């Protein structure tokens, strides 16, 4: 069980003695029980337990940050922090717009503020939580940006903030739980509206999993909406305001390539009479940004169903925004029929893709490929077309 942190323990974690101990055991192959015995023996039970928690978080942080092994987090802070490539992409927007100073109104572990500072921007960063600011301050030191970044423990909605462009990433977690209702985020939508008011520019970072229409109801209307995906997963929805907006209504961006698609929302692609020779699975950034129809129009593709994101056509196409799959067989989502298809194509393993189907990929695999019929690997698409559930065996075209 994770140690409940207090300010005293947080300050102990960033002390030289504890840092040296953590470094000492960084490369150890000792089992966790032996490591925590050493930690508690050297620093006491509470601090030792907190060190063990931090050690585990740092292992995960390496997936997000180049020097994550040296940084400081709580679990909620790490989970909300942007991956470094995403934060760098966002920071470049501020640079390109000509901003040399930014206010970060809810800085968390400091990752966004640090990335802005690394881009040469002066930053004043605020957070209401003292433990958070202890860690953010130390992270700024670890990353070597203290000349450009100042951390303040204060409620950004209660103090008079400096003028200039503002960065906002409202807290969407309480303890280990994600807060689904945006009205419960901190700062609240109303408070964020007040913080954005009269500023030359603002960047509001939001969850891509939240309904976009709900966000538009609650937050000030943005000048641009961008959805950013990283390595195939939608990571952020960003509302851009003022001089940070690029002049388009919607944008989908794929990282690390940096490829971008922009346009007006929700232009609807026509629906196909039947599924063609190829299925195209749009990148989630394209789906969340409402730009699937625009992409379909440009490439002469059609929806397989107006409420399902898959597109179809008869020509093989290459696009960073679309996975191209060659259709091998189609039938109703009946285990008996699908297993015949699996046997006929000598399928040994499948990757599941699904839309409009509630079953998990694991459950679908067990139901439709209960045993190996050969040594071939294909993609199996479970989806809905009108009122029917169908299964499509397909080959991913790399």
Residue ranges and their predicted role:
Residues 1-398:
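SAM-dependent transferase fold signal centered on methyltransferase-like domains
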């Amino acid at each position: 069980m994770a140690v409940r942190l207090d300010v005293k323990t947080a300050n102990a974690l960033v002390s030289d003695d504890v840092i040296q101990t953590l470094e000492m055991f960084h490369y150890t192959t000792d089992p966790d029980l032996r490591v925590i015995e050493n930690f508690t023996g050297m620093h006491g039970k509470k601090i030792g337990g907190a060190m063990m928690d931090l050690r585990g978080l740092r292992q995960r942080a390496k997936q997000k940050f180049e020097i994550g092994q040296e940084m400081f987090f709580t679990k909620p802070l790490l989970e909300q922090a942007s991956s470094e490539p995403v934060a760098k992409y966002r920071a470049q927007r501020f640079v390109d717009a000509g901003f040399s100073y930014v206010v970060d109104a809810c800085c968390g572990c400091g990752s966004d503020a640090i990335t802005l500072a690394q881009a040469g921007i002066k930053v004043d960063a605020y957070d209401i939580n003292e433990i958070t600011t202890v860690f953010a301050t130390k992270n700024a030191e670890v990353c070597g940006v203290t000349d450009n970044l100042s951390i303040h423990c204060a409620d950004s909605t209660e103090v008079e903030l400096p003028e200039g462009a503002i960065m906002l990433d409202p807290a969407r977690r309480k303890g280990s739980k994600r807060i689904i209702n945006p009205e419960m985020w901190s700062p609240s939508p109303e408070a964020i509206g007040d913080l954005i008011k009269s500023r030359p520019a603002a960047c509001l970072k939001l969850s891509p999993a939240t309904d976009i229409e709900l966000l538009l109801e609650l937050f000030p209307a943005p000048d641009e909406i961008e959805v950013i995906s990283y390595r195939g997963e939608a990571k952020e929805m960003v509302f851009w305001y003022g001089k940070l907006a690029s002049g388009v209504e919607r944008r989908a961006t794929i990282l690390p390539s940096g490829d971008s698609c922009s346009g007006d929302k929700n232009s609807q692609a026509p629906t196909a009479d039947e599924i063609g020779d190829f299925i195209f699975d749009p990148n989630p950034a394209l789906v969340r940004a409402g730009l699937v129809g625009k992409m379909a129009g440009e490439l002469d593709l059609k929806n397989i169903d107006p409420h399902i994101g898959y597109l179809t056509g008869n020509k093989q196409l290459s696009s960073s925004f679309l996975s191209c799959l060659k259709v091998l067989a189609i039938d109703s989502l009946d285990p008996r029929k699908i297993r015949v298809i699996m046997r006929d194509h000598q399928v040994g393993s499948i990757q599941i893709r699904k839309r409009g189907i509630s079953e998990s990929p694991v459950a679908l695999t067990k139901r439709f490929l209960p045993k190996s019929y050969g040594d071939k690997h294909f993609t199996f698409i479970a989806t809905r077309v009108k009122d029917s559930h169908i299964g499509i065996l397909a080959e991913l075209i790399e």
